[in-house]
Amino acid sequence: MALTGGFAFWLAIMKGIRMTGTDEEQGRMYGIFEALNGFASLLLSFIMIGIMAIAGKGDLVTGFKSALACMGGLSLVSGLLVLFLMPKNAQYGSKPEEDTESNKITVKDYLHAFKIPGVWIMAILVWCYVTVSAVASYLTPYSTDVLGMSAVVAASIGTIRTYGCRLAGGPLGGFLADKTFKSVAKEQLLGQLACLVTIGIFLVLPGGTSGGLLVVLLLLVGIAMFLCKGTYFSIQPEMGIPTHISATAVAIATLIGYLPDMFVHTMFGNWIDQYGAAGYNKILLYGVGTAVLGIIAAVLAVVQSKKIAKRKAAEQAA
């Protein structure tokens, strides 16, 4: 599943989204995808639960196998639709010179991708989102164990943060990037600043804080997270990453950016086991530090974006 899903499907769809819109539309393209992806995940989860209940008839293993078979069938149908309905030489919003036969990716292109500063900036932005997302997952038990929120309310808000904020944050980030800032790098800077502020506030909240205030803050953390997640791959044109190596760039950024998933949850769990309630403060401080790193990466992205824009302007004037 990791090979077929993460390796093959994910990279192809990321490049496909980039090809769907022009450079000026990248924020909205990825933001809308993020929202639709969240909606589809939520919808399919409920559908699969229904299939498990109907097909299993009390047998959990049979129900689970039936749900897996349905998911596999949907994946197969989706792949066939793309194969037969998508034009072979589709270019959509990408520039024709970037997708010609002469520009097929080579080993040299793979190596070149590692040398592009924007690829590493994108990887750091992904790293920061993944880490902040892990920190946010501990806000639910923190709100109940330390701040005194009802467990039912905290769990409900956690679900809304995961799905509802995804539906709102992705398109909002894309709109801000394309229409307000005219720059994904600047929108990423806003998102990282929002993560810093919202997580930082939890560090100073006293026990017994108003439930209404906690609900608002938990949702704001979710919005801040998805302002970052919805657009971090759409930063590629600003970073001077050519369309024909887009999938390679995403692969590098994903490989590096998702490394925190390998250790942060274990580390956070150890802190809570060792320090109790004080362990949550360590987690929040780690989140604040990560957000600072994200701000630095976003500032570098803004600088790099301006440098790339000046270079393109000079080339056009020549």
Explain the meaning of each model-derived region.
Residues 45, 116-173, 229, 264-265:
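Extracytoplasmic gate region of multi-pass secondary transporters
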Residues 169-183, 272-273:
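Helix-to-loop junctions at the C-terminal end of transmembrane segments
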Residues 84-108, 310-316:
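Flexible cytoplasmic inter-helical loops of multi-pass small-molecule transporters
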Residues 183-232:
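C-terminal transmembrane helical hairpin of 12-TM major facilitator-type secondary transporters
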Residues 72-95, 297-302:
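C-terminal membrane-cytosol helix-exit motif in multi-pass small-molecule transporters
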Residues 1-36:
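Cytoplasmic helix-loop-helix junction between adjacent transmembrane helices
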